[in-house]
Amino acid sequence: MIAVRDATGRELVLQSPPRRVVSLVPSLTETVFALGRGDVLVGVTCYCSEPKGAVERLERVGGTKNPDLDRIRALRPEVVLLSAEENRREDFAALQAAGAVFVSFPKRVCEVIQLIRALGILLDAREAAARIAAQLDETLAEIGARPFATRPRVFCPIWRNPWMGFSSDTYAGDMLAVAGAMNVLGERAERYFEVELEEIAAAAPELVLLPDEPYVFKAKDVPALAALSDTPAWRNNQVHFIDGKALSWFGSRSASGLSYLAQIVRESRR
């Protein structure tokens, strides 16, 4: 028998490891493969792009916000992997009625360690989960052992038209904090919100990070940031395009993503 708790506090009890799993969370799809259990996946979202060369064979069941529930039911999953943030409450309710669901919702990088261990229990991949969790734990320790003299003020939008940002009460926000940066929008009460560039300019960011997801920032978007042209980030050529997965994909990518962001932050202070 397998018993594991998810982010809602619910205990998921199964008689044996699931052999048919649907993942509606791209980062967890990648994590399942990293755990060596990609063979149990029977359906994923159209945004599940990793690992390349393996995920392409899987049935697509729509997007994270608009999954095809009938198609999912037809796949007869024993467990559906969800995110409290990426997926809709109504889809959770519908899928829960059809079978078992496992919900993830890490808002802190350190919480990913427990998530990975829980997935290891659920999928009967405890040893692989222990290795991945240990890697993240070691990365957190290594970064923590190198204190930051100062933390650069950073602006990291996630959308344009309208411009949107995120607070410190998010996984991405905590990734920036642990990596050594200070999110200029970190103290906002909302977790995700629209923002005016004039507000950002007033905060005088020293570093601007432009991820390639969810909005795909490219060179053509830089002129739209002209309101920031008098900020330290602009004057010191500290506007960088970054890998959005490193910032927001929690799971097996967390350790490498954190190291990647910490390096960018440190290099910005040289």
Question: Where on the chain are the PLM-derived regions?
Answer:
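Short, structured coil segments at secondary-structure junctions
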Residues: 37, 56-57, 97-99, 179, ...
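His/Asp/Glu-enriched short active-site or ligand-binding loop at hydrolase and phosphoryl-transfer sites
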Residues: 45, 169-193, 241
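Short glycine/proline-rich, acidic loop/turn segments that cap or connect secondary-structure elements
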Residues: 49-50, 222-241
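Well-formed, non-transmembrane alpha-helical positions, independent of function
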Residues: 71-74, 94, 175, 199
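A ligand-binding cleft/hinge motif common to bilobed small-molecule-binding domains
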Residues: 88-94, 207-225
